[in-house]
Every structure is written in structure tokens, then in C-alpha cells.
Design a protein with these regions (language model features):
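Envelope-exposed proteins and targeting segments
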Residues: 24-29, 44-52, 97, 136-138, ...
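Low-complexity, acidic Ser/Thr/Pro/Gly-rich terminal tails and inter-domain linkers that flank the onset
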Residues: 11-45
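The feature marks short-to-medium sequence segments in extracytoplasmic or secretory-pathway proteins
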Residues: 55-132, 176
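Surface-exposed edge beta-strand/loop patches
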Residues: 102-104, 122-177
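A mature extracytoplasmic/lumenal domain signature
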Residues: 32-34, 54, 58, 66-69, ...
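Short, solvent-exposed beta-strand/turn "edge" segments of beta-rich domains on protein surfaces
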Residues: 33-49, 61-64, 129-131
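Bacterial signal peptide processing site
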Residues: 4-5
Length: 177
């Protein structure tokens, strides 16, 4: 990858499998990306999901990440049914202002939320934030043109001004079911 100076302004080129142990209190590993079975209404596009393992290494700082109105989006456009996937996605993407994505040079929509891990119940639940010492997944959902080659997602955290982290993926990275 590129420059991986922890704590500096920018980390570029975090690729699948890459791990960043502590970046402004956040640990990440770009875990996987895969196709989502549901096809978007927009012809010539497909949905893909990107999972990033995340851990909050701070003792007392909560990190708000992704859409902050998750409950409202899921109440307005519950999934299932499948008919609500597009509306849910567009609302999620519009609310995920701390993420931007581009695919083969063109801007694409990207929705983001946290899936928190509860070690007591050994379950995951959707969340708007990552609490101190919390772990889970950052779930990114993107709508990309079919036949895409390269995808980059830039994260601009609300808790660390003027710092960005960019995840870079290629179509070859997609996990085939």
C-alpha cells in the first residue's frame, strides 16, 4: 500500500487484508467485499457490500460512524421486503456524509453503518456508533456499475478533523459465494 503513518493526516490504499492497528484511536482491517443478491432498480448496476473490522481503542471516546438516523431509515424503509432495498439504500447513502466513494473514476453512492458485536450474547446489532473499547464491523453498501474494475471509499471521520482513510479494492477482491 501507500503511506501508512499511524496518527498522521492520511492513510492511503488500505487494501483487502490490510490492518491498521491504531489510527486516531480506531483500529481497522479491510476484511472482505461481496455481491449482494438483490439487484438495484437502476439498470446496469449492482450492489456490493464491504466489511471492515473495527475496534475503538480509546477508553472514553464514542465514535459516531456512518448514518446517524439509522432507526428512522429502517422504520421508513424496512427490509424485508426486498422492494424497500433501493429506498433504504438511497436514504442510508444520503445520511452517510462521512464517506465518499468512486468507482472507475466516477462518484458512486455509499451507505455506512456499524454492526456492533456483543460478546455476552455473541450477536451483532446495527448501530450508529462504536463505543469505547467496542468492536464490530463497519458495513458499507455501494451501488456500482456492472463490470467495474476499481473502487475506492474515503472515510472522513467526524472525530478527527482533516484526516482521511481510503480503502482501495478491485473487482478481483470480491468474494464469490
Amino acid at each position: 500500500g501507500g503511506c501508512q503513518q499511524n496518527g498522521s493526516a492520511t492513510i492511503v490504499d488500505v487494501k483487502v487484508g490490510d490492518k491498521v492497528s491504531n489510527w486516531n484511536g480506531l483500529g481497522v482491517q479491510l476484511t472482505s467485499l461481496f455481491n449482494i443478491d438483490t439487484a438495484p432498480a437502476q439498470a446496469g448496476y449492482e450492489y456490493i457490500a464491504v466489511l471492515v473490522t473495527v475496534v475503538n481503542r480509546t477508553k472514553n471516546q464514542t465514535f459516531n460512524i456512518g448514518a446517524q438516523n439509522l432507526a428512522e431509515i429502517n422504520a421508513a424503509y424496512p427490509v424485508p421486503p426486498q422492494e424497500n432495498v433501493d429506498a433504504n439504500f438511497h436514504a442510508l447513502a444520503a445520511a452517510s456524509t462521512d464517506f465518499s466513494a468512486s468507482c472507475d473514476g466516477q462518484s458512486v453512492e455509499c451507505g455506512a453503518n456499524i454492526s456492533l458485536y456483543n460478546s455476552n450474547s455473541q450477536t451483532f446489532s446495527d448501530s450508529t456508533n462504536l463505543p469505547p473499547q467496542g468492536t464490530g464491523y463497519l458495513q458499507l453498501m455501494l451501488m456500482v456499475p456492472k463490470g467495474w474494475k476499481q473502487l475506492s471509499v474515503t472515510y472522513m471521520p467526524t472525530f478527527a478533523a482533516d484526516k482521511t482513510m481510503t480503502f482501495v479494492m478491485t473487482a478481483a477482491d470480491v468474494t464469490r459465494a
